[in-house]
A protein has these predicted regions:
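Metal-dependent phosphohydrolase cores
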Residues: 1-171
Length: 171
């Protein structure tokens, strides 16, 4: 990962097992870690532009999708916020995380929360661009196959599908 000024604010978080393992989790057909680091960079720039607290914004950006599969599309912000609180994160970071899915979740109540909402949406567009660009040379499909093998969620889902298929078609 190249150095970016934003990473000075999150250095202590980058070695947490839950953050490290995002390199093996699929998110928008790319590694979740790519989405999170893209969100961090976007949050850094937006927080400077909108005069929000940089530290709060980039820390929330890195943690906003941690344990996202423990919730649903509308509740995973609350799940990630609770996890961040359990790690000792500032309440402002947790509040921003909880509302990052607006308008599907609660409305942001601070400038920092709005920064995360915008950064997450912008990062998601970057994720889609990364995936589509990779389709041209085959990198995206290769990466998606690798993630399906290393991501515990998709590995279990594939095993369930295979068992159902085998039960249906193999005597």
């Amino acid at each position: 990962m190249e150095h970016h000024a934003a990473f000075d604010y999150i250095r202590d978080l980058l070695t947490l097992p839950e953050v490290v393992e995002t390199r093996h989790h699929m998110h928008h057909s790319i590694p979740k870690h790519d989405h999170l680091t893209r969100s961090v960079r976007m949050s850094y720039h937006l927080s400077r532009l909108l005069h929000a607290d940089i530290r709060t914004c980039v820390r929330a950006a890195l943690l906003h999708d941690i344990n996202s599969r423990a919730g649903t599309l509308t509740t995973h912000g609350r799940v990630a916020a609770r996890w961040a609180a359990a790690q000792g994160e500032d309440p402002a970071v947790c509040a921003a995380i909880e509302s990052h899915m607006y308008p599907l979740g609660p409305a942001p109540a601070s400038r920092e929360a709005w920064v995360l909402v915008l950064a997450d949406k912008a990062a998601s567009l970057g994720d889609i661009k990364q995936f589509l660009t990779g389709l041209i040379d085959g990198r995206s499909l290769e990466e998606r196959r690798r993630l399906k093998e290393t991501d515990p969620y998709y590995r279990q889902r594939s095993q369930r599908r295979f068992r159902r298929w085998r039960a249906k078609y193999v005597p």
